[in-house]
From Swiss-Prot:
UniProt-recorded name of the protein: Aldehyde dehydrogenase
UniProt-listed Enzyme Commission number(s): 1.2.1.3
Keywords on record: NAD, Oxidoreductase
Organism of provenance: Rhodospirillum rubrum (strain ATCC 11170 / ATH 1.1.1 / DSM 467 / LMG 4362 / NCIMB 8255 / S1)
Keyword Oxidoreductase tagged: yes
Length: 506
């Protein structure tokens, strides 16, 4: 099925010509009255405008959030859980619309937004609705007459900065636990993908009290920095590149507030020789695991961008893998048959293409792809890159630096020790993959990898109840899982004596 392009008669959603900020339950134009063009990566054409906000708009959003914080923070867990479930219901009722909008805004295939992005977002809201209902305080009996009570209280007003690779899903990862915990939010979407989060906000606006959720669009230095450096937020959560994460951490340290940072990665995907002991469905699954580098156009922090293959397996495995890469269907993201769509921006496409040049200059061999994809017709102005496979060694820049595109760098290893050394030879530690039929090896090797998530005989699964986060320069803190509530709460201890007698110190 091919969905109609925006602005045409058969389009399932009509975008507004211009989108304002959502502050205090209403749509408000930016204080300075400026807007910027929003381009769809599918064709490279402008399809609407978004507010180009500044510190003045962030201030208005913070005013609204602080005005709502006390009342929202005092709602019961049952009330907040009910609202989160209603949000999930609203998203479910509008799943196709949100999937369409996300594909237009980001350029990813609509088959992924229909099957993964939006269903996962729905599930995350339901999951944290359940988590907050199940959360309990605790008490400790110190002695016969002294009790320590522990209460979970919201932080208050928090800031959230969302990336452009999964706008709705990454927003949900932050919104769901923050709302469940009783916080008010000022959220800034990425300037590359400002609209899908606003469409989501339109759909759920009536479900939340004014001021609880505020969405302010704009550029990083003009809107993101004033939010992250504000003395009026109790926490900042950020997903994006490591260099920006360092700046966010500096701002937070000046105000002594906690941060959650989900940053870059250069994830190893390790294939042991025993996977080829039979040519069966598991071997085919491992081949698919290799090709996961192209999912979401490689624009995933955990993209398996380094494939480490046992030397005795290499020839047979790479032949099968390249055959699978060759049949990846690239085309219009609005076609449900398309497997790989457009990169999110022309800047990102140019970065990816520059790394292809770097790989060649370093002496890497191009096994597949290696160039811009020319799709013709109305897609000619879009941002398309061929799925690319390089063969090289782990010291090359294409092995060490995050490309954030459909590019995988392949090398071989002799034994398990060398594989572990190669896997950990990186500044990053977000994701990784291990493929083996040996359960003991899978456990041993998985524990040895210095990464926050180790997919074992699978890849790119993101359930709500599995903790996600990085080691090393891939970030601080965790997202998802009920432990995420801890990142948006603080513990109040009431230490109470029920003894009428004096303590006897003075």
């Amino acid at each position: 099925m091919l969905y109609a392009a925006p602005g045409t008669a058969d389009a399932i959603f009509a975008f507004k010509p211009r989108y304002d900020n959502f502050i205090d339950g209403t749509w408000q134009p930016p204080v300075r009255g400026e807007y910027f063009d929003n381009v769809t990566p599918i064709t490279g054409k402008v399809f609407c405008k978004a507010a180009r906000s500044t510190e003045e708009d962030i201030t208005l959003a913070l005013d609204a959030a602080h005005a709502a914080a006390d009342r929202w923070g005092r709602t019961t867990a049952a009330e907040r859980a009910l609202i989160l479930n209603r949000i999930a219901d609203r998203l479910q009722d509008n799943l196709e619309t949100l999937a369409y909008v996300e594909s237009i805004d980001n350029g990813k295939p609509i088959r992924e937004t229909l099957a993964a992005d939006i269903p996962l977002a729905i599930d995350h809201f339901r999951y944290f609705a359940a988590c907050i209902r199940a959360q309990e305080g605790s008490l400790s009996q110190i002695d016969e007459t002294t009790i320590a009570y522990h209460f979970n209280e919201p932080l208050g007003v928090v800031g959230q900065i969302i990336p452009w690779n999964f706008p709705i899903l990454m927003a949900t990862w932050k919104l769901a636990p923050a709302l469940a915990a009783g916080n008010c939010i000022v959220l800034k979407p990425a300037e590359q993908t400002p609209i899908s989060i606003l469409v989501l906000t339109e759909l759920i606006a009536d479900l939340l009290p004014p001021g609880v959720l505020n969405v302010v669009n704009g550029f990083g230095l003009e809107a993101g920095k004033p939010l992250a450096s504000s003395k009026r937020i109790a926490k900042i959560a950020f997903t994006g590149e490591t260099a920006t994460g360092r700046l966010i951490m500096q701002y937070a340290s000046q105000n002594l507030i906690p941060v959650t940072l989900e940053l870059g990665g250069k994830s190893p995907n390790v294939f042991f020789d025993d996977i080829a002991s039979a040519d069966d469905s598991f071997f085919d699954k491992a081949v698919e695991g290799f090709v996961m580098f192209a999912l979401n156009q490689g624009e995933i922090c955990t993209c398996p961008s380094r494939a480490l293959i046992h030397e005795s397996l290499y020839d047979r495995f790479i032949e099968r893998a390249l055959a699978r890469v060759a049949v990846i269907k690239q085309g219009s993201p609005l076609d449900t048959e398309t497997m790989i769509g457009a990169q999110a921006s022309t800047e990102q496409m140019d970065k990816i293409l520059s790394y292809m040049d770097i790989g060649r200059e370093e002496g890497a061999t191009v096994l597949a792809g290696g160039a811009r994809a020319e799709l013709g017709g109305e897609l000619d102005g879009g941002y398309y890159v061929q799925p690319t496979v390089f063969k090289g060694n782990n010291s090359m820049r294409i092995f060490q630096e995050e490309i954030f595109g459909p590019v995988v760098a392949v090398t071989t290893f002799k034994d398990e020790d060398e594989a572990l050394h190669l896997a950990n030879d990186t500044h990053y530690g977000l994701g990784s993959g291990v493929w083996t039929r040996d359960g003991n090896r899978a456990f041993r090797f998985g524990r040895g990898i210095k990464a926050g998530r180790v997919w074992t005989n699978c890849y790119h699964l993101y359930p709500a109840h599995a903790a996600f986060g990085g080691y090393k320069q891939s970030g601080i803190g965790r997202e998802n899982h009920h432990m995420m509530l801890d990142h948006y709460q603080q513990t109040k201890n009431l230490l109470v004596s029920y003894d009428p007698k004096a303590m006897g110190f003075f």
